[in-house]
């Protein structure tokens, strides 16, 4: 998370910074490591506040996932729950139930990029 914070600090206005915290999925979710997943969530919760403190006026932070993965579920496949979408910064507000295309649209609008039809 420290490296991500450095990237956010040095990002040019109008740029996109992307991070994938794959360990939630690969190390804990699919391996059904409940205690490891809990520790990772507690770490992330503590660190994300620091990152949010680095946001500048006009920045947008979007947190989401490509799927849910309940580490208490039997087996190693993806589970049925929806993925959260959390937004902070410019343009943040109540989104309701949305899909991946809506997340892409939110980011595209923020960056001033037209969405294809």
Which stretches of residues belong to each language-model region?
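Feature captures the catalytic ectodomains and active-site-proximal regions of enzymes
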Residues: 1-117
């Amino acid at each position: 998370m420290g490296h991500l914070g450095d990237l956010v600090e040095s990002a040019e206005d109008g740029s996109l910074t992307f991070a994938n915290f794959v360990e939630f999925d690969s190390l804990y979710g699919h391996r059904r490591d409940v205690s490891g997943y809990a520790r990772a969530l507690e770490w992330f919760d503590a660190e994300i506040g620091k990152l949010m403190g680095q946001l500048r006026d006009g920045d947008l932070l979007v947190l989401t996932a490509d799927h849910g993965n309940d580490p208490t579920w039997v087996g190693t496949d993806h589970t049925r729950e929806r993925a959260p979408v959390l937004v902070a910064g410019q343009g943040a507000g109540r989104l309701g139930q949305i899909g991946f295309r809506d997340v892409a649209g939110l980011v595209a609008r923020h960056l001033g990029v037209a969405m294809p039809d």
